[in-house]
Amino acid sequence: MKKQDHQASTKSAGLGFGAFTKKFALPLWHWYASGFLLLAAVNLVNLQIPQLAKIIINKLTTGADLSDVRGVALAIVGLGFLMIIIRSLSRIVIFWPGRRIESASKSYFFSRALRLTEAFFTSHGMGDLISRLANDIAQLRAFYAFGVLQLLNVVFLTVFAVARMASVHLLLTVCSLIPLGVMFVITRFAMPRMHTFSRENQDALGILTNRVTEAFVNVHVIQANGATASFAARAAEQNAAVLRTSLRLVYIRMFIFPLMTCLAGVSQLVVLFYGGHEVIAGRLSVGDILAFNVYIGLLTFPLSAMGIILALYQRARTALERLGDIDRAKPEGRLDPESHTAPDSASALPLLEVRRLSFRFDPGHTTSKTAPAQTPLVLDEVSFKLMPGERIGLFGSIGSGKSTLFNLITRIYEPPAGTIFWRGVDVRTLEPTQLRREIGYALQQVHLFSDSIRANIAFGLSLEPSLAELEAAAHGAQILTEIQAFGQGWETEIGERGVRLSGGQKQRLALARLLIRKPPLLLLDDVLSALDQVTEKKLLESIYARGGSLLIASHRGSALARCDRILIMESGRVADQGPFEVLVERYPSLDCAT
């Protein structure tokens, strides 16, 4: 006897910082190289200004006339304008790859998320995933754009400025840089705490986004139950948590940034005291001291920017860790590829066979009946065969396992090996997309998209359907007349989740989406609940007349009366089976539900 828990997604290696950079940033190396050259030019021009200022001061201190330094002053102004032009170009060139990385990584992680299993989405809130794909990727963009820009500025200004300072007076350079070196030690110890607080902040933001998304999706339920105030209070509480974690990061920055400025001031004091002594001794000129102070001023910005860079790096690192949950999760696919054989559509095998299927929602563990289990079995030893063209009904109360069975057949939940077979082949060896193309599954909860009626019916088709195909599908779902009555017909926008349609129209539109695909098997999970008796009767006549195999679950006997046989589901087991006429005598509830 085979038992299976609902399995958690297994992990594979995800994108680390280096791998992410190689995948998304390295292909844009020519943009970064161009930005590198432009920033080098900016900083070289910038470092000429102190030298020109030194010339002006030295000339003026030796009694030169203003006319003697006019040309040098104009050169400084010209270099300033040149810096504006080159710096603007450098920002454009370096920021552009950041946007490209943002766009490419959003597409990558979104595409990756769409291929993940139901287990992943069960353990992650929709709002939290939206936050990861929006806010966290925005943090990566900030680092690979503004962060890279500032990092290059730091490297160039530090190397060039220190080289110029050392060429003037090596010992004074060493003494003036000691206070700035202290800052690197302080930031090194601050980095782990910044990373921890960044993770807490981005996790809290993900929870808040999830709360807000849930509220907007279920706003009618919240209002109908008078829970507006309590939901708002919960959101406010989580918003306060985001604020608290944000303030922790702010406190660290409030400590680091002023300290950087203060230490830069200490460096300038060192230059004034020690440099002044050297001027008095005749080993340095006044112009040299001025140039030194300008260089220290130039170094103040990149060292202050180090705090920004560290903050951006920590937030980007945290973002990549959170996105790594998406990247590491195992996508849908063949679970047993080594035993894969192609389904035989021409054989006399059952179209669908379920063999002693047992299942419980308990990720990561396989238990037997005698072993202690965290959750009860949802399905217990379910077995049946569905032949091509056969129509089977599932009758049972809520919680009897009908929907879970359908989710296992379509591999929304992963079934145990050797329990579900499609055309004689274990479904675990099939690609989920291949399997689902042959099975039309209408879920209890209708899912429509904010688009036109045409787009919703044609959803999932590789080719644009003809008008005749659309009309045939809509007619089969008993909604053609209503579509034609809409002002814009097939192009009518139905709003988010089909808000402009009634409950019955939503169900029939979703059914038309299945019928246009003409799958060999239809799985209908209580899809008639919002229909009146007349529409239900017409729709059932259309479904039974289409041919093909049918597996329909309902708590209304009228929907199952025409099935070849009915399985009675009780507490996850097949309690009985047979034709409607036989079972109705043993189960009066089947007749009462007609």
Describe each region flagged by the PLM.
Residues 437-440, 445, 456, 473-477, ...:
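ABC-family ATPase nucleotide-binding domain "signature/switch" substructure
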Residues 204, 227, 251, 299-328:
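Cytosolic ends of transmembrane helices, especially the final helix of ABC transmembrane type-1 domains
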Residues 27-41, 149-200, 271-284:
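Transmembrane helices of ABC transporter permease
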Residues 107, 325, 349, 421, ...:
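ABC ATPase nucleotide-binding domain helical subdomain, centered on the C-loop/LSGGQ "ABC signature"
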Residues 410:
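Helix-to-loop junction immediately C-terminal to a conserved catalytic motif
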Residues 22, 26-27, 118-119, 135-144, ...:
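An intracellular "coupling" helix at the cytosolic face of ABC transporter transmembrane type-1 domains
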Residues 1-46, 61-76, 90-94, 98, ...:
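Membrane-integrated ABC transporters
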Residues 75-87, 180-184, 253-267, 273, ...:
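Hydrophobic alpha-helical segments in the permease module
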